Amino acid sequence: MKQYLDFLKWVLEKGKHKENRTSVDTISAFGYQMRFDLSKGFPLVTTKKTNFSAIAHELLWFIKGDTNIKYLVDNKVNIWNQWPYESYKKSQDFQSESLKEFIQKIKDDNEFAQKHGNLGPVYGKQWRDFLGIDQLKKVIEQIKNNPNSRRLIVSSWNPSEIDTMLLPPCHTLFQFYVNDNKLSCHLYQRSADAFLGIPFNIASYALLTFLLAQETNLEVGDFVHSIGDAHIYVNHLEQVKTQLKRNPKELPKLIIKNKNIFEINFEDIELVDYEFDPIIKGEVAV
């Protein structure tokens, strides 16, 4: 996707060296926006292989209101593992297990998973139970019954619970917009890992828009992505330069078989005609 490559170029050109809460410094710039016409294909990055299975499972995890990594690791999704592991290492139960051993315990021992696999009241909790309000269900009802509303908003940023989250929400608020029988989505993201995170975030909220459009009998419109602190970790610079040498391919298509968003399973979502360049690996900063 040209929009994503242009974003990477912008961070490299405008960004400044900056320290942060992790042990890895960044090249950081502030304030950027991308727009994707979802009718022209599903916006999954093609200039490196991007793990759609992980993206879809994570979104379904959000939709279910789940905040425990057990569902994810049971489905071979490991993008959240590091945070509960770091928390576990500080607990009295820690017995010098490696990350791999910790994850195996999450898979094998439900009691252990319940105690040590939870991330706190992160995305799923806020979407489905923000101080007792099911925001996702409510916004779907509003889209169906009052599509011209300017209040079609879901917020993941709950100041009263931020300190109890292992990682506060990076993608903090999204708004829907209905026009000409098309559903569009606008995401505001406070913090954006340009190399590892943004390809996931684009695809995740595009998928959410497709799911809600089907649920509400609408076509898909645009996905608009606004970013606050956009950064490339310094240990990702070579990977980004490699990716910028590649040319985007045609976007894949998405087939959704189940109309009810609250009953949908991974098997109901099919990605077709996805062509991609080889994977480019990078370490996540915790």
UniProtKB/Swiss-Prot annotation:
Intrachain S-S bonds: none
Which residues of this UniProt protein bind dUMP? R21, R150, R151, R190, S191, A192, D193, N201, H231, I232, Y233
The UniProt catalytic activity note for this protein reads: dUMP + (6R)-5,10-methylene-5,6,7,8-tetrahydrofolate = 7,8-dihydrofolate + dTMP
Copy the pathway line from the protein's UniProt record: Pyrimidine metabolism; dTTP biosynthesis
One Gene Ontology CC term in the entry: cytosol
Give the UniProt record's GO annotations in the biological process aspect: dTMP biosynthetic process; dTTP biosynthetic process; methylation
CDD domains registered for this protein in UniProt: TS_Pyrimidine_HMase
Keywords assigned by UniProt?
A: Cytoplasm, Methyltransferase, Nucleotide biosynthesis, Transferase
Which E.C. number(s) belong to this protein? 2.1.1.45
User: What is the annotated localization of this protein?
Assistant: Cytoplasm
> What does the entry list as the binding residues for (6R)-5,10-methylene-5,6,7,8-tetrahydrofolate?
N51, D193, A285
Q: Which residues cross the membrane?
A: none
GO MF terms listed in the record are: thymidylate synthase activity
The superkingdom listed in its UniProt entry is: Bacteria
Q: Which residues form the active site?
A: C170
Assembly and interaction partners? Homodimer.
Job description of the protein: Catalyzes the reductive methylation of 2'-deoxyuridine-5'-monophosphate (dUMP) to 2'-deoxythymidine-5'-monophosphate (dTMP) while utilizing 5,10-methylenetetrahydrofolate (mTHF) as the methyl donor and reductant in the reaction, yielding dihydrofolate (DHF) as a by-product. This enzymatic reaction provides an intracellular de novo source of dTMP, an essential precursor for DNA biosynthesis.
Family the UniProt entry places it in: Belongs to the thymidylate synthase family. Bacterial-type ThyA subfamily.
This protein is called Thymidylate synthase
Q: Which organism is it from?
A: Mycoplasmopsis pulmonis (strain UAB CTIP)
Q: Which gene encodes it?
A: thyA
